[in-house]
């Protein structure tokens, strides 16, 4: 496979003869200066192929024209061993990556080179440039369809749109990656579509675990994995979301298939852009981010659209540094999404998984015209009950729940039961917990929440509602608990 890499990353042979040839004049980490003595300079965002002594080409992307004969480029792999004077060939266009059916079940890097020790890609595999304009506005789909996930708290409070963008915001260790994995599982179970996963700046161990899990679960044959991991240069982490999006666009445009695009983690894309900006000598903006932060985020997000009746649905994990939701990177990403799923560290500490905050999370789809009046009403009542409970928590911690009025005690009891009912075991965690995953239809979620709000479960143990699927399952658990109690406990005092 190694011998095939230069051919995969090089431009078409017939164009190579006319492309300018240059030489490396300076190497500063991932930043390379290249001089071209003759011919026109490569354009901004064009690819360069640099020949190295070990025979493995380095792909770089032009970022600036320094003078009439020199460009500054950003390397997409390590420049260790690169020397001044190394020959450089301009590719004549942006980086192109392989797309199509041959990519299903494969793991590739930012330049499209397979990294799964599999067979080489077949000759004639189509290629597309990673820099593309969004589809014309007139061709973009405007119909709103709900993307049912089977996850109760998401379907109830932050419904996702098929063809829309949803982001999962949370700090370290609150369950973002597990939630993304469960959504991949839901896509395979519920929708006959393609999944494209972009691993952006995450740990190599997590990437290997995901590849292994997908092989064992049977998900891999309908999935493309695109990795730019934590140990790779910032240029690779900066461009890998565009590679994944290009693969997804091909299935949407040419194969007319619905695509689920998952990115973990979009914050690392922004972080890599900040590194690149610093390497290129640009003045930083707020909190040290690149001055082009909003432009870079928009350039990625505005390409994620539906065309006609074929959709690209994006689910993005977003790391929140120091749990600060006012961070410029977080706010820039949030401006582009339809649904904000906020993961709470305090809920994770209480074991309320998925640790989704029902108050801070929101969705533009939670509208009676989209989800229906009954759904919207139940969601509002659930939020109102949980919010009232939170307002009383300080009083409860100081004086105890017994000091509350009868109405407040009733609301607190129902809010606690709602919080527990909205937890559920996931299929992707079954190997660790031993509890089979549950996928719950929206109708069952609404029926369960309505019953709790109406007081039908006021005399139930809270534990009966914890980590279940439907209310029927909770009812069986409650009945089993009551049957297991000694007779004396049932007797009147």
Swiss-Prot record:
Gene3D superfamilies named in the record: 2.40.10.170, Bovine Mitochondrial F1-atpase, Atp Synthase Beta Chain, Chain D, domain 3, P-loop containing nucleotide triphosphate hydrolases
Keyword Secreted part of the UniProt annotation: no
Location (main, coarse): membrane
Molecular function, one GO term: ATP binding
Region annotation Disordered: where it falls in the sequence: 113-138
HAMAP family xrefs: ATP_synth_beta_bact
Name of the protein described by the UniProt record: ATP synthase subunit beta 3
